[in-house]
């Protein structure tokens, strides 16, 4: 059976009915969801669940990503790993603790991230504006990455690149959508809200991908380990945000699949409405399922698989020293 991400927006209760998940909504509806069909479960509503439901999800290796009020990401329940490797975790921590090894991996992550930002601007240069000078600056910043000798220097180069990249958004987006500047917690306008929501989806996709390996999601290389976040997921997400989040922002806005009516402004800032979230998620899942011909694998792979391939490449690098192939847009 082909597995897919499943999103639940209803409020209610999630329970186990033999080998199937049962959803009882507050409106009195009952739905059944075969657990074998789920790659990851996303809970967007106010859902209660018991240990029997978690046991079933754990047995089938299904992660659960939980979103709170107005779809703010709250955390993930990660089931017991199908792959356990103490050696992998040891090598991951050793690489983090070794400045040279950590920088080598960090360089590849940020080089790929800047490359993918630059690829977006190259695509829109001439279509939505003249971005040639920024494209050239991003090329220079990508080259400068390998010269950094400390993680804070590396992050400074990435921050400079991202600011210049975001400065081009207002030229790419159709009015009345504007970014002005990147703001979150809370998002200050519709574009910031859309970017934040999609960045969250990319992040949780990376959490799911890492869970399928023996890598520890809390040990990153660019982002410092913290108590409340999976820093390796943040690292991998930086590679894929331009590809999966930003390109979708441009497409949704410029094709008018999303309008200002899909947002609401409150004291908490500007946020997507429920209908807006449904529209965005449908397109995001469609994007994950799209395929490209992979030059190394010699076959078509989905973007969801591309994230998984990236993570496996990092794991192989840690264990064998083979080059880490951080994903740079080639198509």
From Swiss-Prot:
Alphabetized UniProt keyword annotations: Antiviral defense, DNA-binding, Endonuclease, Hydrolase, Magnesium, Manganese, Metal-binding, Nuclease, Plasmid
Gene Ontology MF: a single term: DNA endonuclease activity
Enzyme Commission number(s) of this protein: 3.1.-.-
Cofactor: Mg(2+); Mn(2+)
Protein name per its UniProtKB record: CRISPR-associated endonuclease Cas1
Disruption phenotype: Loss of the 8 Cas genes in this locus (cas1, cas2, cas3, cas4, cas5, cas6, cas7 and cas8b) leads to loss of CRISPR interference against plasmid targeted by this CRISPR locus, i.e. plasmid is not destroyed by CRISPR.
Quaternary structure annotation from Swiss-Prot or TrEMBL: Homodimer, forms a heterotetramer with a Cas2 homodimer.
Miscellaneous comment as given in the Swiss-Prot or TrEMBL entry: There are 3 CRISPR RNA loci in this organism and a single cas gene locus. A CRISPR-Cas type I-B system.
Family affiliation: Belongs to the CRISPR-associated endonuclease Cas1 family.
Function: CRISPR (clustered regularly interspaced short palindromic repeat), is an adaptive immune system that provides protection against mobile genetic elements (viruses, transposable elements and conjugative plasmids). CRISPR clusters contain spacers, sequences complementary to antecedent mobile elements, and target invading nucleic acids. CRISPR clusters are transcribed and processed into CRISPR RNA (crRNA). Acts as a dsDNA endonuclease. Involved in the integration of spacer DNA into the CRISPR cassette. Plasmid targeted by CRISPR locus P1 transform wild-type cells very poorly.
Positions bound to Mn(2+): 158, 223, 238
Gene: cas1
GO biological process terms on file: defense response to virus; maintenance of CRISPR repeat elements
Highest taxon above the source species: Archaea
